[in-house]
Amino acid sequence: MKTISAKFEASQRKWILVDAENQVLGRLASRIAMRLRGKHLPAFTPHVDLGDFVVVINADKVQLTGNKWDQKLYYRHSGYMGGVKVQSARKLNAGNPEKLLRLAVWGMLPKNRLGRKLIKKLKVYKGAEHPHEAQQPTRIAL
């Protein structure tokens, strides 16, 4: 018996719509990452992009448990000495709620060429409106 390896050309990728309102950030991000990779499919192949496109709405209404709004910190660096910038989750969500969810999902994807390709299939919007109506995304509850 031979092992079947899925091919990218034979994949049927769908568009999925996810409402992030009152969803816990980490749990939602792990389910989105699973969909992006295609791990929900029986023909999952680790090195092939078989996952769906995911459109997330209401990213500004995502929830964090405990005191993570103030205790969870996001770091970035300008490249200069002493150029480290630190933001709490509350401040990041107030300024750019899409980035909060995108960083959570990015942390759960592989850090290679495939991961960079997968993160491009994630579309995050802070309101209930999105410009992907032409793709007719299927609304699912994760």
Swiss-Prot record:
<dbReference type="GO" id="GO:0005840">
    <property type="term" value="C:ribosome"/>
</dbReference>
<dbReference type="GO" id="GO:0017148">
    <property type="term" value="P:negative regulation of translation"/>
</dbReference>
<dbReference type="InterPro" id="IPR005822">
    <property type="entry name" value="Ribosomal_uL13"/>
</dbReference>
<dbReference type="InterPro" id="IPR005823">
    <property type="entry name" value="Ribosomal_uL13_bac-type"/>
</dbReference>
<protein>
    <recommendedName>
        <fullName>Large ribosomal subunit protein uL13</fullName>
    </recommendedName>
</protein>
<keyword id="KW-0689">Ribosomal protein</keyword>
<dbReference type="InterPro" id="IPR036899">
    <property type="entry name" value="Ribosomal_uL13_sf"/>
</dbReference>
<dbReference type="Pfam" id="PF00572">
    <property type="entry name" value="Ribosomal_L13"/>
</dbReference>
<comment type="function">
    <text>This protein is one of the early assembly proteins of the 50S ribosomal subunit, although it is not seen to bind rRNA by itself. It is important during the early stages of 50S assembly.</text>
</comment>
<dbReference type="GO" id="GO:1990904">
    <property type="term" value="C:ribonucleoprotein complex"/>
</dbReference>
<comment type="similarity">
    <text>Belongs to the universal ribosomal protein uL13 family.</text>
</comment>
<keyword id="KW-0687">Ribonucleoprotein</keyword>
<comment type="subunit">
    <text>Part of the 50S ribosomal subunit.</text>
</comment>
<dbReference type="GO" id="GO:0006412">
    <property type="term" value="P:translation"/>
</dbReference>
<dbReference type="GO" id="GO:0003729">
    <property type="term" value="F:mRNA binding"/>
</dbReference>
<dbReference type="GO" id="GO:0003735">
    <property type="term" value="F:structural constituent of ribosome"/>
</dbReference>
